[in-house]
Amino acid sequence: MKTFILDFLSKALDDFLHKNAPIAESIKKRIEQSERERKELSGIRKIANERAKKANLHNKKLRDCRVHLNAEIPAKNKEEFQIKKLASTIFITEGDSASGSITKSRDVDSQAVFSLRGKPLNSFGLTKKVVYENEEFNLLQHALNIEDGLDGLRYNNIVIATDADVDGMHIRLLIMTFFLQFFPDIVRNGHVYILETPLFRVRNKKETIYCYSEAEKQKAIAKLGGKPEITRFKGLGEISPDEFGKFIGEDIKKDPVLISKDAPIQKLLEYYMGTNTPARQKFIIENLVVEKDDAIEMEPEEVLV
């Protein structure tokens, strides 16, 4: 039976490819490209993995947690351990300043921190070879344990934690491009999130209100009355560890990065992260937003940190 089915499929496929030469040529090119990539990877994978293993012994970029998604459930306290597995989280931050506050305020049982060094590489259009050649990408894939697929994923929640400014938004896009380019299923399966942190702190001697938008700030000012102290958080590193603990605890606000199963990922990446095109230039011009300089526009009672 097996031989019959294989012969039947082989003949049917052969007939189809002969009748559809463009499709056959496209498949041929894809096979040849995959073979070239495989040969390139084989030469650097061993070296990169050896470097990563050495780094993992004392990876300065990773502050790991105790419980991971891929951990075996012990005989005792099964339910409690399962809850911690599902809560396992890794925060990907920009720089040591931001990671410092998170590291000091995190739950060491289920929250890990991975610190990037500034803006990562734009990986759109690159082959997977760059994942092994680029030190940060290689260390990140080993921290997540996704080199061979998602079965060994170590964290259920991958949270991108960047400043809420233009540079921070750019870093978010670069990290998401990395995942969508090389590990799209990690996004499709709902593991990737964006951390929301407050933009303002409005307080008087009796009450403190954290605000995530200008509208929330105005409501807080109206509620407290008088002249409350208003603090504008310019970056994650400027939020104290004591305060940060409130934003990554039970009341954490994180937006899921959602993408449908049939979304044209490559077309989206090409449009937003590829080379400049007239269409993208037009989109940028039509959606350009000029931000006010808070340092200049600051009200007398506001404090900038």
Q: What is the predicted function of each stretch?
A:
Residues 1-305:
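Conserved phosphate-chemistry cores used by DNA topoisomerases
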